[in-house]
Amino acid sequence: KIALSTPVELENDFPITFQLQNSAPIVERVDFKPSFTENIYFVYLNKKQSSKASIEKYLNRQQDISEVVSEIETITKLTIETNNFPVFSKAIEKHEAIMSAVLEMETVKQKYFNDFNGTVKSLGAWGGDFVMVLSEENPKEYFKQKGFETILTYEEMIL
């Protein structure tokens, strides 16, 4: 089980990074103001899943993830620092592929949106309520045709 040694505020009005070091939460505020916010969307899937159940399932596997953690840290740093949309998109795709392998689950794009021309990133419990969508073109019509009506721009989401 993951037990935090100190309470941590998990809701914030600003971007953060979060990690555990020796069961202690490390929360850092980050400056995330990419020049390509018009290419970032959030789609509500209405497929609520339990993060707790996903975490427990993962923890029962007893995998050594030190290499994965290092790779994820590198990707996180890149996504925070880059102002290049294709670089950001590729980094997000790499993160999603790594998590897919670790969790032994197909990505949300593979499962629901394999014909989408862009990036789809699971948020929260994999395949849960929201996904982040990265696209050169407005993807709202695509997702509406798939039956998803709630599509928010980056600006709408961060209000």
Segments and roles (model prediction):
Residues I2-A125, M132-L159:
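C-terminal nucleotide
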